[in-house]
Amino acid sequence: MSQVAHFTINAEDLPRTRRFYEKVFGWKFQAWGPPGFYMIDPKSAPAAIALRGSLQQRREIVKGTRMTGFECTISVSDIHATEAAVKAQGGTIVMPVCTLAGIGQLLFFQDPDGNIAGAMQYDEAAD
């Protein structure tokens, strides 16, 4: 099966957005290629987890803003610590933590540059 192999975070203010993801998720970035382009150091991210994907009806996570393109959800070990880190680094929680039975706890956030993504603490025992 083919799998997603790369994603890109688009930003106007690269230093601010870079700091946000470094502080919230512990990622490290390295300048690579053309000016204004950075690669996430794969050694700074946790080991890969099994691919989880879905297809769904287009929706609004932020009222009046329909999601476009691919929706990215980042696996985290502590959803509440991630929620606090997002807020501390200038992000906004746009969908509060909710529990998906048998899957885990999910939230959606908006980074300081306006990108919307999810964070999921996987837990098969969630109810």
Region spans (language model):
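Core segments of cupin and vicinal oxygen chelate
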Residues: 2, 8-50
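Short glycine-enriched loop/turn motifs at secondary-structure junctions
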Residues: 1-3, 63-69, 100-101
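Mid-chain, well-packed structural core segment of small domains
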Residues: 65-90
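Conserved, structured core segments of small domains
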Residues: 41, 46-66, 75, 112
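Structural motif
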Residues: 4, 50-53, 69-71, 104-106
